[in-house]
């Protein structure tokens, strides 16, 4: 027992000695000072923040432009120190430039030690003062090479290796300060990285990598940067403001963390972005584990950059309409599927059925989605042109191809450079003003970029743009950013270029990416108004992306490692990024820059927001956007908010209507439209023409039945077969509407089964009668049985053809004769029905032969004519129907059946039938030959005796025998005298 207790105590002691804390946290605790005094506490706090010693030794071009404190006597580029008003950039005069003035001033912090950012600012209703950061001395003397240095922040060395060797500088700093993390002073061979990267420090290794196009592309080598983008500066300010707000909120303060940022200037160029990311992750000690997410604010097509982002496997939040799907990618704006649906909804609203599409590599996947949606919605894409490069030659060829098409509306899914070349090509090809209506995604640079501003005066076509709906509080956010932009710690070069581009002036003679091309020199006093500098800027998407990452981070920490001291995102989970991306998708919050609660569509990963469709007009040297309609993202419905037939600036009218009936696409669209509309029996019941035709068919069937009754009571010979023939004509009349009803399972079955049976009921008795007459056989019950057997054989044949045919009753056919749904097997459906009646055709031919052989018989003439009619009927349909269009073919077939029934009904009353030779009194005496009447003249007494004998014959057999004998003697005598029967007594 004592051994067990001792063993239990050892187990408990070993568990207590286990340390589950992270390596960083254990290092912090192990390096704690033994004595507690204020100085040691400050050193310990510095040890917890591994990014305190971030410092950049700027290149020589930055040294000439210190922005630590803007001078109060003149423009900031002319004085070493200066101050600027909060809203109006009009610095007051001060006698002491080194101290902050008493008035409302804002200090512009230069590209300095970011450990002091953001600066402590005390704001009141009228004034605000900013404490100036201290000056840090660089230690460039310890570096042998004369290169630019970057004080980096991570414990890891420069190269991305798991077990790197510590540098000498790291060993030296660890000896000097045992309470801080190792800091590495790494050599940066490229000045470009210093110009392209801005780091906002964090007390932890938690950074958001923001890819923002601070500069535009040069458009030449696709590597160098062009002019600065004032929209990007404003959006970067919104990003920094959102980051500051989320760090100062209780959301992150409660867990003791704050999130930093690494802003990379992509210059809207793929190669430069790749170089910056590569040097950032391999040329500095910034590691992948320091990054928690990526905010991509550059919508430029950058396949190589996207490949690097996929290799990083970080959650990506896009702030634009995403054109390509990727893993762990979401967005605060919808994907391109929603703008495509918006365009289609607007086109359908204005009854446009035909469009053209021009696109480049960026929208290659979106075009396939557009074509699929357009096909389902009944809109034809006449021409889809892939613009492979942004050259003038290619653009001119595209314009020539558009001029050859019928469509007036052109959906232009183009990048910036391609769109510029397209506007030039429209001018060089001298396209008539208002010839096309272009629909494109609205770009913020349309109102700020010099390339666009110079192209709008010569653009004479109509332009429709798609853009997110502006939130209600957007203007208030712009005013707030107007006050905060001068407070940002921006690189001096960025600030000079922003000033120059915003006020269309040049600061000095330095090369600043084309900004010195402005001839006017910048004034010493300027008022900043973002609504005029960047009138179309949208800051909501990037602000919401930052807040979504912050809220998702808190949710992820609470779910995975609650209560832990989080230094990096991988402290609790080995692979945290999949779960963190899921936390971003699950985030749901309310923000003042969104009219509805912010949430992500779980199936797509993007937000569903309302889109605004604008009409763009260049009026008085400015672009004006007038709203045409709003698209609901839930129901994909378009709500028109203005008239689309309003006059433009040049007197033409915008007509959102485009058709191309002669194009191949329209024909294919018609096929798809007809194919989608499956015929049904319900539609046939409501069609007026079909109902009228059916009424005539029923009347024809009733007429045949009435004639059958009259014929049966008036004919003594073969009356049963005659009744069956008339019954077949009635069934034939009823089968006629099946050919005019739209093809469906019921009508097709009636066509294949009822028509052959009806025609067999009509022809089989005629065939049996002709054979019996030819054989001189009288009518009997067996003759009806023979006709019934023939009908049964035809029924079996038709049923087998119906069951052994294709599985579907209908088939969609598109040939020269038309495009429509038809009974299977499609084009040859009527031909197959007539082939199934081959037995009836053979019987009709035999009936014709036998009737011709017994033409002397009284009923042979009508049998002959009915046989000829049946042969002509079947032959004419079999030969002519394949040559008739589909819509006319069914009508011809149904009408011919009714005509055949009516003509056969008339032919059945022709010929020398015995019924026509009988008298109305039952067949006593007919006036056939006057010579016969002269030799047989009876007195009235003899006539009365004859009548009495007739009545007596019905009751007395002996009298009947005498009467028959007398009649036979009279007939024999008349035959010998005149060669014909003089009269005929009725058969008892």
Swiss-Prot record:
Signal sequence bounds: 1-17
Any one of the GO CC terms: plasma membrane
Known glycosylation sites: 247, 389, 529, 601, 720, 974
Membrane topology, record value: Multi-pass membrane protein
Protein name per its UniProtKB record: Uncharacterized protein C30A5.10
One GO biological process term: G protein-coupled glutamate receptor signaling pathway
Chain segments carrying region Disordered: 111-176, 966-988
Compositionally biased spans, kind Low complexity: 114-140
The entry's keywords: Glycoprotein, Membrane, Signal, Transmembrane, Transmembrane helix
Chain ranges passing through the membrane: 690-710, 721-741, 753-773, 784-804, 832-852, 864-884, 891-911
Organism whose genome encodes this protein: Caenorhabditis elegans
Subcellular locations according to the entry: Membrane
């Amino acid at each position: 027992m004592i051994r067990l207790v001792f063993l239990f105590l050892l187990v408990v002691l070993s568990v207590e000695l286990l340390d589950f804390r992270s390596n960083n946290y254990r290092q912090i605790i192990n390096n704690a000072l033994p004595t507690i005094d204020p100085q040691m506490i400050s050193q310990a706090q510095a040890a917890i923040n591994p990014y305190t010693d971030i410092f950049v030794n700027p290149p020589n071009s930055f040294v000439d432009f210190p922005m630590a404190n803007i001078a109060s006597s003149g423009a900031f580029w002319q004085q070493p120190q200066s101050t600027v008003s909060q809203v109006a950039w009009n610095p007051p005069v001060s006698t002491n430039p080194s101290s902050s003035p008493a008035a409302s001033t804002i200090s512009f912090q230069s590209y300095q030690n970011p450990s002091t950012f953001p600066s402590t600012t005390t704001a009141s209703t009228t004034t605000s003062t900013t404490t100036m950061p201290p000056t840090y001395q660089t230690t460039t003397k310890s570096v042998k090479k004369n290169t630019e240095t970057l004080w980096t922040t991570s414990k890891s060395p420069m190269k991305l290796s798991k077990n790197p060797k510590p540098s000498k500088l790291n060993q030296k700093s660890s000896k000097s300060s045992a309470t801080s993390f190792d800091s590495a002073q790494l050599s940066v061979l490229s000045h470009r990285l210093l110009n392209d990267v801005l780091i906002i420090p964090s007390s932890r290794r938690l950074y958001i990598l923001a890819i923002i196009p601070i500069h535009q592309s040069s458009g030449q080598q696709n590597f160098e940067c062009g002019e600065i983008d004032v929209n990007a500066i404003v959006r970067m300010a919104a990003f920094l403001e959102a980051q500051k707000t989320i760090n100062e909120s209780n959301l992150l303060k409660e867990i003791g963390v704050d999130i930093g940022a690494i802003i990379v200037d992509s210059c809207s160029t793929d190669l430069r972005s790749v170089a910056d990311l590569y040097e950032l992750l391999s040329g500095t000690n910034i590691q992948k584990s320091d990054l928690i997410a990526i905010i991509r604010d550059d919508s430029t097509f950058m396949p190589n950059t996207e490949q690097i982002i996929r290799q990083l496997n970080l959650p990506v939040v896009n702030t634009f309409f995403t054109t390509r799907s990727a893993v762990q990618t979401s967005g605060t704006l919808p994907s391109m599927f929603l703008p495509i649906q918006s365009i289609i909804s607007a086109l359908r609203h204005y009854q446009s059925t035909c469009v053209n599409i021009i696109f480049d590599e960026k929208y290659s996947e979106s075009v396939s989605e557009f074509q699929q949606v357009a096909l389902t919605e009944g809109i034809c894409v006449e021409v889809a042109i892939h613009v492979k490069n942004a050259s003038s030659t290619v653009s001119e060829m595209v314009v020539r191809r558009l001029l050859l098409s019928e469509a007036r509306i052109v959906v232009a899914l183009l990048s910036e450079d391609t769109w510029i070349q397209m506007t030039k090509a429209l001018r060089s090809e001298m396209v008539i003003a208002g010839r096309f209506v272009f629909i494109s995604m609205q770009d913020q640079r349309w109102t700020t970029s010099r390339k666009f501003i110079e192209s709008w005066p010569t653009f004479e076509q109509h332009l429709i743009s798609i853009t997110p709906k502006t939130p209600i509080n957007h203007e208030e956010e712009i005013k707030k950013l107007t006050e905060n932009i001068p407070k940002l710690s921006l690189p001096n070069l960025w600030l000079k270029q922003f000033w120059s581009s915003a006020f269309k002036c040049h600061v000095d003679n330095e090369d600043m990416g084309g900004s010195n091309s402005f001839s006017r020199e910048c004034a010493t006093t300027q008022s900043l108004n973002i609504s005029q500098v960047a009138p179309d800027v949208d800051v909501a998407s990037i602000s919401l992306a930052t807040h979504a990452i912050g809220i998702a981070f808190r949710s992820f920490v609470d779910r995975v490692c609650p209560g832990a001291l989080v230094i990096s995102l991988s402290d609790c989970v080995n692979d945290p990024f999949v779960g963190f991306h899921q936390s971003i998708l699950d985030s749901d919050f309310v923000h003042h820059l969104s009219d509805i609660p912010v949430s992500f569509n779980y199936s797509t990963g993007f937000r569903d927001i309302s889109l605004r469709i604008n009409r763009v007009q260049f009026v008085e040297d400015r672009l004006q956007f007038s709203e045409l309609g709003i698209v609901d993202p839930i129901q994909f419905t378009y709500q028109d908010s203005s008239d689309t037939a309003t006059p433009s600036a040049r007197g033409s009218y915008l007509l959102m209507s485009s058709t191309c009936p002669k194009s191949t696409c329209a024909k294919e669209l018609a096929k798809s439209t007809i194919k989608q509309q499956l015929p049904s029996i319900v539609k046939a019941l409501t069609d007026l023409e079909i109902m009228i035709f059916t009424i005539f068919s029923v009347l024809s069937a009733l007429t045949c039945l009435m004639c059958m009754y009259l014929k049966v009571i008036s004919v003594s010979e073969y009356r049963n077969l005659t009744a069956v023939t008339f019954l077949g004509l009635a069934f034939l009349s009823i089968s006629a509407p099946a050919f005019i009803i739209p093809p469906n399972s019921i009508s097709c079955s009636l066509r294949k089964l009822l028509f052959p049976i009806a025609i067999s009921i009509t022809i089989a008795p005629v065939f049996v009668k002709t054979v019996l007459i030819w054989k001189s056989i009288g009518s009997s019950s067996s003759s009806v049985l023979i006709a019934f057997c023939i009908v049964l054989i035809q029924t079996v044949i038709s049923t087998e053809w119906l069951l052994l045919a294709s599985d579907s009753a209908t088939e969609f056919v598109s040939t020269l004769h038309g495009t429509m749904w038809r009974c299977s097997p499609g084009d040859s459906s009527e031909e197959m029905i007539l082939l199934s009646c081959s037995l009836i055709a053979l019987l009709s031919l035999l009936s014709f032969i036998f009737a011709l052989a017994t033409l002397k018989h009284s009923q042979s003439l009508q049998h002959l004519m009915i046989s000829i009619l049946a042969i002509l009927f079947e032959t004419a349909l079999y030969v002519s129907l394949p040559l008739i269009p589909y819509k006319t073919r069914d009508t011809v077939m149904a009408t011919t059946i009714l005509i055949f029934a009516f003509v056969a009904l008339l032919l059945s009353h022709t010929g020398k039938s015995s019924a026509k030779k009988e008298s109305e009194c039952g067949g006593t005496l007919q006036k056939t030959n006057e010579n016969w009447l002269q030799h047989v003249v009876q007195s009235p007494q003899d006539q009365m005796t004859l009548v009495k004998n007739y009545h007596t014959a019905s009751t007395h057999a002996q009298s009947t025998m005498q009467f028959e004998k007398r009649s036979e003697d009279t007939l024999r005598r008349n035959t010998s005298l005149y060669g014909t029967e003089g009269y005929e007594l009725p058969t008892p």
